[in-house]
Amino acid sequence: MKNLEPDLDGRFRKALSFPTEAHLNPRDALVKLANYIENKGANLHFEQDGYDASHANITIDARGLSASKKLAGLRGVKGEMLIIKTDEVRLSRPVRMLHPRIPLYIVPRANGHFMVGATMIESSERGRITARSMIELLSAAYALHPAFGEAEIVEIGTDVRPAFSDNLPRIIKQDGIYYLNGLYRHGFLLAPALARMAREMIVEKAQPELFIQKDKDDEPYRQRTSA
């Protein structure tokens, strides 16, 4: 602990280290991903631009909970988080804390900012944070280091994660549309794998592990095999 996170030295008896675990700022990642695909020649269109995608040859729907009216069983799991700021604590990696009810973590960001998250509540409400959640998140930060008790609360965030009953992602072909959904808490982690499966399915006609076919008139996809 002293070598990895000096500011936490002496505060905890035991900890586990995962040297290859990475973290990112999802907002920055979205901007960079959009710039990347535009630089590769793709065009980005948005609903407010009046773009009509109904005439596209292939449509992939990855809108999360916004597709719930089309996908039976897709539910929302609410998540709440805080961004706090202090110059009194320095962390170089995410720190996860054991919690009796929810897995809490604190992720360092630039300029003394830390993201504290995240709750898991069976609800599709996405507009407010509860007092209980606020207390739990702040208590977790304070338990990690008392200096967080004097931190500035910069932002309060709430939204919902799309999930099916088993909390596993799925690729569904329905009404001519490919739906990639149900990534739950693991959107950025699983998105590359689902994108690969979708490409293999559309281009190579291979059936991915997570595929559910609801268009009965389609030709069957060949079962994907692992090398």
Please describe what each predicted stretch is:
Residues 55-65, 195:
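Short hydrophobic core segments
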Residues 63-175:
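Active-site substrate-recognition segment that forms the wall
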Residues 5-12, 53-57, 163-168, 173-174:
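A short, glycine/Asx- and small/polar-enriched loop/turn
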Residues 151-227:
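C-terminal catalytic lobe of FAD-dependent flavoproteins
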Residues 1-35, 39, 163-164:
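Flavin (FAD/FMN) cofactor-binding and adjacent substrate-gating region
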Residues 4, 22, 42-55:
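A conserved short coil-to-beta-strand element within the FAD-binding core of flavoproteins
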Residues 40-44, 145, 198-206:
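Short, hydrophobic alpha-helical segments
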Residues 17, 119-122, 183:
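Short, histidine-centered active-site or binding-site loop motifs used for metal coordination
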